[in-house]
């Protein structure tokens, strides 16, 4: 990996009513990473989000969960990245992914937004730069595009939530590998994982 990751973002909608909805799966990864490292995320109004800072394998990693609504996520990411002079290719955005099943997660470098409003705004606010990393947390698909909005804003049943949590936990372990050993090794581990 040529660039180290300096910022991990978990996309979410703000407020307790959204906390356990599928659309907030990206934020669960950041929350779990903060918990593992015993760091409390603090509200930082100038960055429009909850922020923290940890060390992973001797490397500084900033954490961010935007407190804007999902479709304005890029505002928070761009504000923090500009302040700390973090380039798009040093950012990883964790987000829910309709095209992957619950219990599955994958790393990806670059690409489009795939209809995800949080990614769409992030690309836009980073000057149409798509070169950031993504951590895609599978939530499954409701089967028809007209059902997507209600599905992502809904809460998963208990068994499905266990799969989502397991994928988020494994993602946290694989982030350590990514930072220490690079993308391909982390992909080899994460992409063969499937919670049952």
From Swiss-Prot:
One of its GO terms (cellular component) is cytoplasm. The record marks 13 as: Discriminates between blocked and unblocked aminoacyl-tRNA. The active site is at 23 (proton acceptor). One of its GO terms (molecular function) is tRNA binding. The keyword Repressor does not apply. It is found in: Cytoplasm. The record marks 96 as: Stabilizes the basic form of H active site to accept a proton. SUPFAM superfamilies: Peptidyl-tRNA hydrolase-like. Keywords: Cytoplasm, Hydrolase, RNA-binding, tRNA-binding. GO terms for biological process: protein quality control for misfolded or incompletely synthesized proteins; rescue of stalled ribosome. TRNA binds at residues 18, 69, 71, 117. It holds the Pfam family Pept_tRNA_hydro. It catalyses: an N-acyl-L-alpha-aminoacyl-tRNA + H2O = an N-acyl-L-amino acid + a tRNA + H(+). It is an enzyme of class 3 (hydrolase). Its EC number is 3.1.1.29. Hydrolyzes ribosome-free peptidyl-tRNAs (with 1 or more amino acids incorporated), which drop off the ribosome during protein synthesis, or as a result of ribosome stalling. Catalyzes the release of premature peptidyl moieties from peptidyl-tRNA molecules trapped in stalled 50S ribosomal subunits, and thus maintains levels of free tRNAs and 50S ribosomes. Belongs to the PTH family. Monomer. This is Peptidyl-tRNA hydrolase. It comes from Vibrio campbellii (strain ATCC BAA-1116).
